[in-house]
Swiss-Prot record:
The active site is at K14, D138. ATP binds at P96, M97, G98, A99, G100, L101, G102, G103, G104, S105, S106. Pathway: Isoprenoid biosynthesis; isopentenyl diphosphate biosynthesis via DXP pathway; isopentenyl diphosphate from 1-deoxy-D-xylulose 5-phosphate: step 3/6. It is an enzyme of class 2 (transferase). This is 4-diphosphocytidyl-2-C-methyl-D-erythritol kinase. Belongs to the GHMP kinase family. IspE subfamily. It catalyses: 4-CDP-2-C-methyl-D-erythritol + ATP = 4-CDP-2-C-methyl-D-erythritol 2-phosphate + ADP + H(+). It comes from the Bacteria. One of its GO terms (biological process) is terpenoid biosynthetic process.
């Protein structure tokens, strides 16, 4: 008789502590330098796997999006493992969609990390990252967690030391930002083509910064220059965060969510009051150690070691 294996997962959101667009590459994509950071805001994903002769995938979620990223992730990881089985998933969204917080990418990464464990197979991190990159440029980051530098399209990753614990808020004003248009508007402002010399100068400037929460005032998000022109309300929200005492306030990704980090917890309540009716979430930064501890706790029934990615106790 086949045994069904279950897991209840939290798929954490991310913010960008810094985001620079260096220019447009010959392949048509933009060269990025960014600092990713996981935060406590999360979706929940219940997933079960039952060995079977053929693969079937069922997803229950209120959004009812055709070809949801988690379904694509499940299909791709099953193909990579050359495994078959019945997969049932229930996704509960809390991370605002299309806000620059990586919710869909994190959900997909959760499937990539969990399914090999439940299916009793091994997929090394480079293979998972390759699958993740095909799903979306942010997905590989959620296979690492904590803080990391992202280069290229953002999917080439270099883990950074964990930044000190800090609390804050994420504001989701519900404004739709056309990411493709934001890139086009930003491209028109970039000086010339991305020559090797220009790229190296911009990379040196980026790398010369010290990435800790004490120096975040030096950070920036290049998208703000064009997105704030189209959506002045977002600029007003950032000003309110600064007025409330945020040590760092910035748009995440291409928007429209913004975040503020605070050294004074009382300032968080001031910020929430100033933000009025806009949807606001209290958050904390999640270190890589804590991120992986959350995963180990969620998958403890099915794992047998502390290596990363998690290894299944059902491996042959």
């Amino acid at each position: 008789m086949s045994t069904t294996r279950h897991a209840h997962l939290r798929a954490l959101a991310k913010i960008n502590l810094d985001l620079r667009v260096l220019g447009k590459r010959p392949d048509g994509f933009h060269e990025l330098r960014t600092i990713f950071q996981t935060i406590s805001l999360a979706d929940t994903l219940e997933i079960s796997f039952t060995p079977a002769r053929k693969t079937t995938i069922e997803l229950t979620d209120v959004l009812n999006i055709a070809d949801n990223l988690v379904v694509r992730a499940a299909r791709m990881v099953m193909d990579a493992m050359r495994a078959t089985g019945r997969i049932e998933m229930r996704l509960t969204k809390r991370i605002p969609m299309g806000a620059g917080l990586g919710g869909g990418s994190s959900d997909a990464a959760a499937v990539l990390l969990a399914l090999p464990v439940l299916a009793g197979r091994v997929l090394p991190l480079p293979k998972l990252s390759h699958i993740g990159e095909q799903l979306g440029s942010d997905v590989p980051f959620f296979l690492l967690g904590g803080a990391a530098t992202g280069i290229g399209r953002g999917s080439e990753l270099f883990p950074l030391p964990d930044v000190p614990a800090q609390s804050g808020v994420v504001v989701a004003p519900g404004i739709h930002v056309n990411t493709a248009q934001a890139y086009r508007d930003l491209s028109r402002r970039l000086s010339g083509s991305l020559t090797t010399e220009l790229q190296q100068n911009k990379i040196f400037s980026f790398q010369s910064l010290t990435w800790d929460t004490g120096r975040l005032a030096e950070a920036r998000n290049d998208f703000e220059a064009v997105v704030f022109e189209q959506h002045p309300k977002l600029a007003a929200i950032k000003r309110r965060l600064v007025r409330a005492g945020a040590s760092a306030a910035m748009m995440s990704g291409s928007g429209s969510a913004l975040y503020g980090l605070f050294r004074d917890r009382n300032a968080i309540f001031r910020a929430i009051e100033l933000l009025g009716e806009d949807t606001t979430y209290r958050i904390s930064l999640v270190s890589r150690k804590r991120y992986r501890a959350l995963w180990r706790r969620a998958m403890s029934e099915h794992t047998r070691s502390n290596v990363w990615p998690l290894q299944s106790r059902y491996n042959p």
